[in-house]
């Protein structure tokens, strides 16, 4: 009986943890979207890259989420693997 209760508790905790992760993923900033005011919230595998432009004599920072080199490599290898499988 103790094992059954432990299994149920573990299952519930796992579901709570997974739902929290999926909410974080939904709230992240996708590729090529602005992240100027929230530079830490780009989706996994992305970094916030900033450019500086001069508008009316004043410098302005514009940032956007961009895939990291590691993520680009993983995507290319995954695509190549899918092509080889078919």
UniProtKB/Swiss-Prot annotation:
Major subcellular site: secreted
Post-translational modification as stated in the protein's UniProt record: Contains 4 disulfide bonds.
Expression tissues: Expressed by the venom gland.
Motif Processing quadruplet motif per record, residues: 23-26
Domain of life: Eukaryota
Propeptide section residues: 20-26
Notes concerning its domains: The presence of a 'disulfide through disulfide knot' structurally defines this protein as a knottin. The C-terminal part (65-85) forms an alpha-helix which probably disrupts target membranes.
Family the entry assigns: Belongs to the neurotoxin 19 (CSTX) family.
UniProt name for this protein: Latartoxin-1b
Classification of source organism: Eukaryota, Metazoa, Ecdysozoa, Arthropoda, Chelicerata
């Amino acid at each position: 009986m103790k094992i059954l209760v432990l299994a149920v508790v573990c299952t519930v905790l796992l579901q709570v943890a997974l739902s929290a992760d999926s909410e974080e993923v939904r709230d992240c900033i996708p590729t090529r979207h602005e992240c100027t005011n929230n530079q830490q919230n780009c989706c996994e595998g992305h970094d916030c890259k900033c450019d500086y432009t001069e508008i009316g004599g004043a410098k302005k920072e514009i940032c956007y989420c961009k895939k990291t080199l590691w993520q680009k490599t993983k995507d290319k290898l995954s695509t190549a693997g899918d092509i080889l499988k078919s």
